[in-house]
């Protein structure tokens, strides 16, 4: 027995005393779960070995230097030349060079990619925080995203790889995402269903991937993720592909896992987003969803030329209208100073406004640590209204003209129970001032695109509340920019 044990130990010892690549390959096939590893061997100075499975990893190279990171922004100020390491692959980094290997230890070739982002985009450029800078960048990046597929009044998804024929054949749309991207999906659902005859389901990726549901034939799964590395969203994408469902990724990071694995990709052009709480990436995802909905309607013959042209004109006004909102941010800063010490907050709205309220609520809780909940306004009477007491702050988003009076009636209900009301609506709806204690107006725009404007005051409000409380706006506690764990 002793001899056998020693023999086994010697066998393992010899196996792991091969090259570092051999040693790592033998170890990796025995590891379960997801990982991104960087390993150094004392007998191989000046070398770093890297491997990943289901977790993001990129490698940057410039001159005599090599960099290993989980995301592009981390190395952007050093280099824009990157390699993407695949699942269950190894990399050996030396000064200014990198080699890749498969699990058989064979060297494989990879193409170096150049990131087009400007390195200055990863700097604060005079702003106090990245979040404030990124809020102010929204007009430009939204315009860039629109112009990437919209030219001379026509939308072309040639770069996305989704043809009009593909759109005609789609019978069901699933939108799968997490966090703020899920709120984008909720807005997209309303817009797609209003413009087309398609049925749309919006699912949380962390729930979708575990459900035993039958996915419809000729369906499209839209996976929304800023980083393109969100673990649950990536798992949901793989599930859809296993079931034969066509997949489309809406992502911001070129070459990310979702971008590589999805059948089609719509890249948002938000540039690097450093602040953990998303603002400009969210807004670019919104306009990407609008453009998809518009082209679905046109390709399927479900929208008139006049209505399509009207929407094209309206979507092109979003950047300049956001500029106007940003010019009046001092009023929001003043209001934020009045609510900086509240313990609870509630957001209400109907339809698209409810989806915006969910995003506003998430922003407030993310960076100011105030307990905040969003409710569909019509659900208040089914329980949440019992939480309203004297002084409770309720934020009401009221931009949908067909739902205006209904939501105003809900505001009256909570005010009669002592709530302090923040009203957010479009210019012209001045009756809001008869109900709300503080009112913010946004420029008028087609109801379908209202979320792009109404979310901006809520972003600013959350920012100023967090600053007023003295918190680290860009790096809120317990949160990460790219959620790569399940």
Language-model segment annotations:
Residues 45-59, 128-131, 142, 179-188, ...:
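Conserved phosphate/anionic-ligand binding catalytic regions in large, soluble enzymes, centered on
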Residues 3, 168-310, 314-317, 397-443, ...:
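Glycine-rich phosphate-binding loops that contact phosphosugars or nucleotide phosphates
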Residues 26-73, 78-83, 88-90:
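Conserved catalytic micro-motifs used in adenylation/nucleotidyl-transfer and phosphoryl/amide-
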Residues 26-29, 138-142, 146-174, 264-393, ...:
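Active-site phosphate/pyrophosphate-binding segments
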Residues 1-12:
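Single conserved hydrophobic/aromatic residue that forms the stacking wall/gate
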Residues 98-168:
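Catalytic P-loop NTP-binding/switch module of NTPases
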Residues 105, 420, 435, 445-486:
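Generic C-terminus detector
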């Amino acid at each position: 027995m002793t001899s056998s044990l020693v023999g086994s130990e010697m066998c393992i010892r010899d196996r792991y005393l091969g090259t570092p690549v051999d040693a790592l390959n033998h170890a990796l096939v025995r590891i379960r779960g997801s990982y991104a590893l960087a390993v150094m061997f004392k007998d191989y100075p000046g070398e770093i070995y890297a491997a990943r499975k289901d977790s993001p990893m990129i490698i940057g190279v410039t001159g005599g230097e090599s960099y290993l990171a989980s995301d592009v922004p981390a190395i952007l100020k050093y280099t824009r030349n990157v390699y993407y390491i695949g699942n269950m692959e190894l990399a050996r980094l030396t000064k200014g060079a990198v080699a890749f290997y498969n699990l058989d230890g064979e060297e494989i070739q990879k193409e170096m990619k150049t990131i087009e982002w400007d390195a200055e985009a990863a700097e604060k450029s005079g702003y106090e925080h990245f979040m404030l800078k990124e809020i102010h960048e929204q007009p430009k990046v939204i315009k860039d995203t629109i112009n990437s597929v919209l030219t001379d009044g026509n939308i072309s998804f040639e770069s996305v790889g989704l043809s009009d024929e593909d759109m005609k054949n789609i019978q069901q749309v699933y939108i799968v995402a997490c966090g703020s991207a899920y709120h984008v999906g909720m807005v997209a659902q309303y817009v797609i269903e209003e413009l087309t005859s398609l049925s749309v389901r919006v699912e949380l990726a962390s729930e979708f991937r575990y459900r035993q549901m039958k996915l419809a034939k000729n369906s499209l799964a839209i996976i929304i993720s800023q980083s393109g590395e969100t673990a649950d969203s990536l798992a949901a994408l793989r599930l859809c592909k296993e079931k034969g469902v066509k997949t489309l990724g809406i992502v911001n990071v070129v070459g990310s896992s979702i971008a590589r694995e999805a059948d089609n990709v719509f890249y948002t052009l938000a540039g690097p987003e450093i602040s953990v709480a998303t603002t400009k990436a969210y807004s670019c995802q919104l306009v990407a969803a609008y453009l998809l909905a518009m082209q679905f309607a046109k390709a399927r013959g479900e929208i008139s030329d006049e209505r399509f042209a009207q929407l094209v004109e309206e979507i092109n006004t979003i950047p300049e209208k956001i500029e106007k909102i940003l010019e009046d941010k001092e009023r929001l800063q003043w209001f934020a100073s009045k609510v900086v010490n509240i313990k609870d907050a509630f957001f209400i709205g109907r339809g698209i406004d409810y989806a915006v309220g969910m995003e506003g609520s998430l922003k407030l809780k993310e960076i100011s640590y105030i307990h905040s909940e969003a409710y569909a306004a019509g659900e208040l009477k089914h329980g949440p209204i019992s939480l309203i007491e004297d002084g409770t702050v309720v934020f009401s988003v009221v931009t949908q003209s067909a739902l205006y009076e209904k939501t105003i009636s809900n505001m009256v209900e909570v005010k009669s129970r002592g709530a302090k009301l923040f009203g957010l609506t479009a210019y012209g709806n001045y009756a809001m001032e008869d109900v709300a204690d503080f009112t913010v107006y946004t420029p008028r725009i087609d109801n379908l695109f209202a979320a792009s404007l109404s979310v901006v005051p809520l972003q600013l409000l959350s920012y100023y509340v967090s600053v007023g409380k003295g918190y680290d706006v860009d790096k809120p506690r317990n949160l990460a920019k790219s959620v790569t764990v399940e």
